[in-house]
UniProtKB/Swiss-Prot annotation:
Alphabetical UniProt keywords: Endoplasmic reticulum, Heme, Iron, Membrane, Metal-binding, Transmembrane, Transmembrane helix
Superkingdom of origin: Eukaryota
Entry cofactors: heme
Segments traversing the membrane: 290-310
Organism: Saccharomyces cerevisiae (strain ATCC 204508 / S288c) (Baker's yeast)
The name this protein goes by in its record: Heme-binding protein HMX1
GO BP field: heme catabolic process; heme oxidation; intracellular iron ion homeostasis; response to oxidative stress
Length: 317
């Protein structure tokens, strides 16, 4: 967003701005996760159950972050928490809250499984989180309790990522309506709107979302410019670097858990999933491993076909 002097805050060339420093230090990790997430999103867009698992995982991630934001805003105790609370109040708006938005998406995505709000809430409260996801959630709470200022790492990396990619993801989802349960009374437009709240920051349209993004970036910079020590800024940057690794790991964990489950069932869904993993994955080692698995799967299919052909032939004879 531009101010009255027609200058963007922070300026892209402002090497002292905390946001720019985070971006510079995490540039390689950012490129790596972008490529990885692009592959995984392409696969998830073809399998609704995988997409739903990803949305569920990030519900818990953002819920953990926003629990800490609420605690720091409403009940700061230590001097460091009071300092962070003052900073948060300068840029945080309820429009940015994601956990309640993701919850709306989960109500739609799980509507065929949980017919009432109570049953969905019970599921969310008792769901056994995968190990790495649980570790990430624990790490969020531990980091912020130890160094309250590190909440600013999550505010920068995760929320700005949604601002940047939300519109693109909504567009892709519009072309993949098979991800959502069928509702006779909802049009395609209504279905996408009800299932993409996670990626939507305003119902007023893209212009308002762009304004909110620049407002967020501007106020984040103004709030952190002089309120933090250099040591605190370095700690925020360090935690920001780790967030990319955690994102990579929890998404990879979803893929690995699905691969194990589908291989155990050996179904058409298993074959299509493995094929798409092989098609979209550019990592040579991963491609070789998946190629080996695909050959094994095809060999098993060939043996089955041969078995039934021989059995049919012998029954005729």
């Amino acid at each position: 967003m531009e101010d009255s002097s027609n200058t963007i805050i922070p300026s892209p060339t402002d090497v002292g701005a905390l946001a720019n420093r985070i971006n510079f230090q995490t540039r390689d990790a950012h490129n790596k996760i972008n490529t990885f997430m692009g592959i995984k999103m392409a696969i998830a867009m073809r399998h609704g159950f995988i997409y739903r698992q990803g949305i569920l995982a990030y519900y818990y991630v953002f819920d953990a972050i926003e629990q800490e934001i609420d605690r720091l805003l409403n009940d700061p105790v230590t001097e460091e928490e009071l300092q962070t609370s003052t900073i948060l109040k300068q840029f945080w708006l309820e429009d940015f809250r994601r956990s309640t938005q993701i919850y709306k998406d989960l109500k739609l995505l799980y509507s065929n499984t949980f017919k009432s709000t109570e049953s969905l809430n019970e599921f969310l409260a008792t769901f056994q989180k995968p190990p790495l996801l649980q570790q990430f959630i624990n790490n969020i709470h531990e980091n912020i309790h130890k160094e309250p200022c590190t909440i600013l790492s999550y505010c920068h990396v995760l929320y700005l990522a949604l601002f940047a990619g939300g519109k693109l993801i909504r567009s892709n989802l519009y072309r993949r309506l098979g991800l959502f349960p069928n509702f006779e009374k909802l049009s395609q437009k209504e279905l996408v709107k009800k299932g993409t709240n996670f990626f939507t920051f305003s119902d007023l349209g893209p212009t308002e979302e762009t304004r909110l993004k620049w407002e967020y970036k501007k106020n984040y910079e103004l709030a952190t410019r002089t309120e933090l020590t250099e040591a605190q800024k370095l700690q925020i940057i360090s935690v920001a670097e780790g967030i990319f690794d955690w994102n990579f790991n929890i998404v990879a964990e979803i893929g690995e858990l699905n691969r194990r489950e589908l291989m155990g069932k050996f179904s058409f869904k298993c074959i299509t999933y493995l094929y798409e993993e092989w098609m979209f994955n550019k990592d040579s080692a991963t491609r070789r491993a998946l190629h080996t698995v695909m050959l094994l799967v095809l060999s098993i299919i060939a043996i089955w076909v041969l078995y039934f052909l021989v059995k049919s032939f012998l029954s005729i004879v």
